[in-house]
Amino acid sequence: MSNFSGFTKGNDIADLDAVAQTLKKPADDANKAVNDSIAALKDTPDNPALLADLQHSINKWSVIYNISSTIVRSMKDLMQGILQKFP
């Protein structure tokens, strides 16, 4: 399971830049894993173990990017709601 070190109990993240920075490393790691899995398939594209590894890497990448997108959208909505309440 991925460890999002910025999202631990008692650790406040106050702005969107901090959220993006916290999610950058897991996203980069997932992207590298997908690229490495694709590179491993170049020699033996019909290897079931390598295909399963690629599928796992893509699923992990997808989950991390969905989490990132959801968090950024939530922060945007929160900030937009706060700004709309100002006169």
Swiss-Prot record:
One of its GO terms (biological process) is protein secretion by the type III secretion system. The keyword Transport applies. InterPro entries: T3SS_needle-like, T3SS_needle-like_sf, T3SS_needle_YscF. It holds the Pfam family T3SS_needle_F. One of its GO terms (cellular component) is cell surface. The keyword Transport applies. The secretion and/or polymerization may be controlled by the type III secretion system regulator YopR. Induction: At 37 degrees Celsius in the absence of calcium. Signal peptide: none annotated. It is found in: Secreted; Cell surface. Keywords: Plasmid, Protein transport, Secreted, Transport, Virulence. Belongs to the SctF family. Component of the type III secretion system (T3SS), also called injectisome, which is used to inject bacterial effector proteins into eukaryotic host cells. YscF/SctF forms the external needle filament that protrudes from the bacterial surface. The needle is not sufficient by itself for the formation of a pore allowing translocation of the Yop effectors across the host cell membrane. The core secretion machinery of the T3SS is composed of approximately 20 different proteins, including cytoplasmic components, a base, an export apparatus and a needle. This subunit polymerizes and forms the helical needle filament. In Y.enterocolitica E40, the needles are composed of 139 (plus-minus 19) YscF/SctF subunits. This is Type 3 secretion system needle filament protein. It comes from Yersinia enterocolitica. The gene is sctF.
